[in-house]
Amino acid sequence: MDLSTYFEPIDISIVDYRSREFRPMLGDTIATYVERDAFPDIEQATLAIIGVNDDRLSVDNRGCATAPDHIRRYLYRLARPHEDMSLVDLGNILPGSEPRDTHFALIEVMHQLLDRGITVVVLGGGDDLVFPIYKAYEILGRVINICSVDSRFNLEGGDEVNSNNYLQHIILQQPNYLFDYVNMGYQTYFVGQEMIKLMDELKFTTHRVGELQADMTHTEPLVRYSDVVAVDISAVRQTDAPANAVPSPHGFYGEQLCQIARFAGMSDKTSCFGIFELNPNLDNHGQTAHMVAHAVWFFIEGFFNRQNDFPYRDKQYYKRFTVELRDHGMSIVFYKSMRSDRWWMEVPCDDDRRQRYQRHTLIPCNYSDYQRAMENEIPDLWWHYYNRLNA
């Protein structure tokens, strides 16, 4: 299939990029779609950027369709994070006559890229685009984890997918290919106790923004476990990201978003990183677009510094620890990477579930989880996924 039929070239008048000789910039390194007869060759690419210029299903945030080229305006001017990068920018997916046509195009594009082993950065566009991203993995038959950096849960009702209810539509798909959904950064006054209880009943993982800000290292295992990391820019506080129709005075700081983005880039498992709901019409002198460009830069920098140290690949690169929990009559197996000092722990389940969820039975964790087990306590993360795998 010719992917170029789904794309339009980048609007250079908005990007306004010019090469500078005094230092190599990211824009000099990316193979970019700027002329109709010169679509980038993806055969050697390992990372692709795509924009989606559609905001018709973004609730109360019309204008976010134009975000991709505004982000590129700042992204291309940043320094090259790595000397040898096989990176392409395929331009922007052409909006269909109906939103569902845009969704179909995104599904096809994601399917083709993921099937080639290419990791994708998606610049939205509205949050509803997470639904067609999920559908692409469904076509590939991959059971996935989604990490949503969002101040809300996106579980509202409605027959048509939109930015406020895409999660509801994902969990209603049958057969279902969602193993876990992680929300990082919800704000209680936006979601309410009933919705928090519902997320708990669904056995999804949720973390308040204040809880994570107390120690941002806790976000790393959550991101490392995710196939898709989707950022709603409203999760970042208004002072750092004003370009959204429903901003909040509270939320993550811009540098914390960059930290999360780098964790996602470093994750061997993450194959899609998306940022949505940035509305340039509401921006302050490009402040939000510039901050998001930094987050994308950190994802790229992390991606090209991946350690490929997921356990089971080569025993010489990790250590295995078995911790006996005497008071509980059980043991937990931990793995530590010798390359990156990152940790994982095994969660047992029956053979049928292990075969279906084989990519999800080894849980990323922190050294603190190992320490807790050494003190004869079962880590909360282990309990959560034990209950999920053995439900």
Outline where the language-model segments fall:
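Conserved alpha-helical scaffold segments that buttress catalytic/binding sites
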Residues: 2-49, 56-275, 279-391
